[in-house]
Amino acid sequence: MLNALLLTVLSALAVGESQSVKVDDRTDVKITLRKDGMQVNWDCAESNMKYVREYYKSNKFRWDFYKGETLDCYLSPHSGAKSKVVAYPAYRIMANPGNYFFRAFLAVSRPNTAVRHSITLKDDGWQAEWFFPFASLETFDFRKNSKKNTTFQPGVNWAFKFSRRSQTTGKTVVTQSPVVVVSIPAEVIDPYRQVLFASLNSDKKGNGVIISAALRNTSAKEFTGKVKFYLHSGKDIKVVATQNVRLPAKGAFRVSSPVDLPELAVKFNVHLEVVDQEDRPVRISADIPIENPWVDF
């Protein structure tokens, strides 16, 4: 249970500074504050890399995070100043040496193009790098059964809990870190706290969709910028519409745009970016899967 994880490490970071975390004698994690997001680096020693390489080359369960080698992290960017736990609402992030990556919020998988991840295999172990842009953080309760119109504002205290699962010795071993709470300067996170998504929807229209979103301004200052609508056609991603946005202080604004789908045998997704007057992304939505009207995947 998340609420049973006790705080043992509290660290204040400036931009460019890192907090090291030891999961066990084979596993080290480094949390680094960047000016636009949080970076997590794993360094995993492994004496049986031959087994690891073969497993993720040929095993049919190589995508399964509950088998093989797995890095696991619970993360809450919404922890209070006195938080002693990785508390609701939390993310769960998992990865393995096959470069399979999983990210869930409120226990629901929500891929986001802005979140970056990579894996490096070495002779004596493997490494993982994750980057979570502040602009990509989830800001509303998107679950269909939710009865609350809740928005989540990222805070200055981020709580982490790390664990590693390994079976290269022939038996499953799971080790975990203490809870780590990282405090970041308010001026770093504030530009990404002003504009929140309060909703995000897609509706079919012919061979395309209408994408709509509700924006909320949490600040006593007006926000002026743009919303960019991105279409993913397979691996190709491009801006298909742009709208000017003027959010009054503590006010709301709705945007919508039709998105036409090209006749291609690919999977489609759409995501939105809110950018300020300097064209800096301050809010990036999760990827919205769109049904292909020509091909059934």
Can you describe what each PLM-predicted range is?
Residues M1-T8:
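Sec-dependent signal peptide recognition
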Residues V9-G234, T242-F297:
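Structural preference for beta-rich elements and adjacent junctions enriched in aromatics
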